[in-house]
């Protein structure tokens, strides 16, 4: 699933190509995504100019002034810039044609993503209003994690992946951040000290920033706005390495299921 770094990579890839350009036409080839694409979306978007492209958690928001297009890439989706004459592939579901011979194409093999119309643009939409702070913003800190974790008995990894606590820390990056911070994913969130949460917050920032700079992690279908895969997966130290030696102490990494997600940790380095 595309996580925050992959969505931010997509935003950075497509924004320079579409910002300031007028939408000429929207072609919906397959409206049956996670939620049906609104029937009035093509008419609402046509003739509007893209003012900016922003990201909130794993959602991409294309601002058109009075309206906003909300994209979620789901489990396997991607947005990329193509030439208008580029042949459409099997899972290409939406084309947004813009002036200057630019086409923004949405591809989603599993169709778990979405394209919605927000009118007017609002952070009060049900998909957005209950989200926690951005992990790369000033609102995110070790102090915040510490305060929100008190009395919680759930594992710290589950707590870290709660989108109401902090957005965008999916399974890959939660594994990596906890490894970097030396915190075992099974430890109760309420038992982690303020000092260790401060270390964890910095680890989250580093892991996500590094992933963004490397174009995200391509494990299955993800490609950026330029159609190229990311390469952060080449630097993974925990995720996907169960049974392999720890890169720090050479202890065999342990792999377990935690909340139906795979968790990998070092029994020696993480406590």
Curated annotation (Swiss-Prot):
Its cofactor is Zn(2+). Gene3D superfamilies: 1.10.8.50, MutM-like, N-terminal. SUPFAM superfamilies: Glucocorticoid receptor-like (DNA-binding domain), N-terminal domain of MutM-like DNA repair proteins, S13-like H2TH domain. One of its GO terms (molecular function) is 8-oxo-7,8-dihydroguanine DNA N-glycosylase activity. CDD domains: EcFpg-like_N. NCBIfam families: fpg, PRK01103.1. Belongs to the FPG family. The lineage of its organism: Bacteria, Pseudomonadati, Pseudomonadota, Gammaproteobacteria, Oceanospirillales. The keyword RNA-binding does not apply. The active site is at 2 (schiff-base intermediate with dna), 3 (proton donor), 58 (proton donor), 261 (proton donor). Monomer. Binds 1 zinc ion per subunit. A zinc finger (FPG-type) spans 237-271. This is Formamidopyrimidine-DNA glycosylase. GO terms for biological process: base-excision repair. DNA binds at residues 91, 110, 152. Involved in base excision repair of DNA damaged by oxidation or by mutagenic agents. Acts as a DNA glycosylase that recognizes and removes damaged bases. Has a preference for oxidized purines, such as 7,8-dihydro-8-oxoguanine (8-oxoG). Has AP (apurinic/apyrimidinic) lyase activity and introduces nicks in the DNA strand. Cleaves the DNA backbone by beta-delta elimination to generate a single-strand break at the site of the removed base with both 3'- and 5'-phosphates.
């Amino acid at each position: 699933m595309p996580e925050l770094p992959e969505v931010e990579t997509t935003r950075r890839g497509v924004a320079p190509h579409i910002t300031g350009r007028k939408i000429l036409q929207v072609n919906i080839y397959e409206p049956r995504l996670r939620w049906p694409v609104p029937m009035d979306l093509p008419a609402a978007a046509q003739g509007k100019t893209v003012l900016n492209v922003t990201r909130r958690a794993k959602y991409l928001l294309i601002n058109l002034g009075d309206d906003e297009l909300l994209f979620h890439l789901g489990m396997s989706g991607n947005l990329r810039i193509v030439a208008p004459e580029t042949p459409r592939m099997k899972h290409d579901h939406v084309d947004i044609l813009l002036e200057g011979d630019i086409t923004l194409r949405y591809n989603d093999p599993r169709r778990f993503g979405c394209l919605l119309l927000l009118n007017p643009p609002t952070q009060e939409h049900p998909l957005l209003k209950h989200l926690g702070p951005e992990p790369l913003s000033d609102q995110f800190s070790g102090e915040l994690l510490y305060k929100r974790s008190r009395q919680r008995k759930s594992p710290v990894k589950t707590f870290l992946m709660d989108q109401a606590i902090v957005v965008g820390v999916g399974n890959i990056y939660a594994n990596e951040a906890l490894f970097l911070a030396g915190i075992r994913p099974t430890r109760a969130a309420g038992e982690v000290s303020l000092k260790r949460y401060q270390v964890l917050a910095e680890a989250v920032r580093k892991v996500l920033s590094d992933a963004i700079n490397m174009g995200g992690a391509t494990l299955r279908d993800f490609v950026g706005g330029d159609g190229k895969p990311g390469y952060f997966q080449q630097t993974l130290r925990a995720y996907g390495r169960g049974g392999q030696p720890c890169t720090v102490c050479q202890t065999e990494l342990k792999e377990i299921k935690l909340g139906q997600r795979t968790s990998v940790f070092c029994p020696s380095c993480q406590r």
